[in-house]
C-alpha cells in the first residue's frame, strides 16, 4: 500500500532537506526517492527472508536459469552447490541496515529515463542487519567413499546381492547425502572406480577388481597384444563366459583409455595405474615391507612390458629411508582426515618430520584454488634443516 497523501513529501520539503544537508541539487539526479516503511515491514527482519551475496559468475548462472542447492545433514555445516562448485555458507553482519525495496531504480537506470520523475515515493518492504556470503571450499567427498564401502560389489554370484536390506545409492541419493556439486560427485565416482549397476552406484570389492584386471592382463599376454591396442570386442568374447561383459568393460575403462580406430573400439592400458594397484595388492596385507624385496616382487608381479617406479605410489605408500633396512608401507591419502588441521595432526603423529617431497602427495588435495603447498606448510608446520635437507614438523604438540 502507498503512504497516505499527508505523509508524502513535497518538492519544497525535499529542497529544504537538501539545504539542511548542504547538498547542491544541481549536482544530483533530478529524481528523488522518498522512502517509507510499508505496513508489512518486519517479515524480513524476523527471518522470513535472507540476503545472499553472489559473485558475478554465480549471478549469471542464476539469471540464465540454473539452480543452486543447499546441502547438508542435520549434523553438518550447510554448503551451497552450483552445478560444478561447492561453497561454504557464512553469515556476515553489517553495521549498516540493508533495506529491501521492490522496484527501486539505481542511478544508472534513472539516467536512462527520458522523462525522469521529480519525486518517487517508495515503500521499504523489509530490512536486515546481516546476509549470507559464499566462500569457495573443497567438496566434502570422504563421505562418498564411506557410503559406497558399506556394500561393495563382489560379483553377480555373491550372496550379498541377494540381501535386499543392504544399502545402495542412486545418483539422486548421493546428491542428497554428499556436500558437493553434481560434477564434483561424478568426477569422484570415476576416481573411486565406481560403476552403476542396476541403477545403483557401487565400488568393486578390491579382490574382485584385481580378479577382473588379472583376466584382462592374462588375455593380453596370451594373445601377445600391444598394451596400447587391446580390442574391446575380443575381450568381451573371450572373457564373457568368466565375468559379466559390463564388468570387463568397466575394468578396461578404469585401467585404460578408450579410442576408436576404423569403427573398432580399443583400449590403451595405463601402465602407471596397473603398477599402482598391483603395489596396493602386495602391501595391503603387510604392515611393513622391506623396500628392496618389495621392489623385486612388485616388478615380477606386473605384466611384461611394464616398469615399476616408486613415483607411481604417491599418496598410496610411504618409504622410510631412515630405517635399516629401508621399508615401505601402505598409507593411502583416502584414509586420512578431510579437515586440514586434522590431516596435519594425523601425518605428524605418524612421522615427526617430513620432507616436502614426502608430504606433498598427502596434502595436495587440501589446496584451494589459489593456495599452494608452500602456503599450507607455512601455516600448519615449522621448517628446519636436517643433514642439509629442509624438513617440516608440527606447530602443535602431537600426543
From Swiss-Prot:
Q: Which GO BP terms, alphabetically?
A: DNA replication; maintenance of mitotic sister chromatid cohesion; positive regulation of DNA-directed DNA polymerase activity; post-translational protein acetylation; regulation of DNA replication
Q: Which GO terms describe its molecular function?
A: DNA binding; DNA clamp loader activity; single-stranded DNA helicase activity
- Which InterPro entries does this one have? Dcc1
Could you list the residue ranges forming a coiled coil in this record? none
Q: Does the keyword Phosphoprotein apply?
A: no
Q: Which superkingdom?
A: Eukaryota
State if Nucleus is listed as a keyword. yes
Task: Name the UniProt key words of this record, in alphabetical order.
Answer: Cell cycle, DNA replication, DNA-binding, Nucleus
Q: Where in the cell is it found?
A: Nucleus
- What GO cellular-component annotations does this UniProt entry give? chromatin; chromosome, centromeric region; Ctf18 RFC-like complex; nucleoplasm
- What is said about its interaction partners and assembly? Component of the CTF18-RFC complex which consists of CTF8, CTF18, DSCC1 and the RFC complex. Interacts with CTF8 and CTF18. Interacts with DDX11.
Protein purpose: Loads PCNA onto primed templates regulating velocity, spacing and restart activity of replication forks. May couple DNA replication to sister chromatid cohesion through regulation of the acetylation of the cohesin subunit SMC3.
Family to which the UniProt record says this protein belongs: Belongs to the DCC1 family.
The protein here is known as Sister chromatid cohesion protein DCC1
Mind giving the lineage of the organism this protein is from?
Eukaryota, Metazoa, Chordata, Craniata, Vertebrata
Gene encoding the protein:
DSCC1
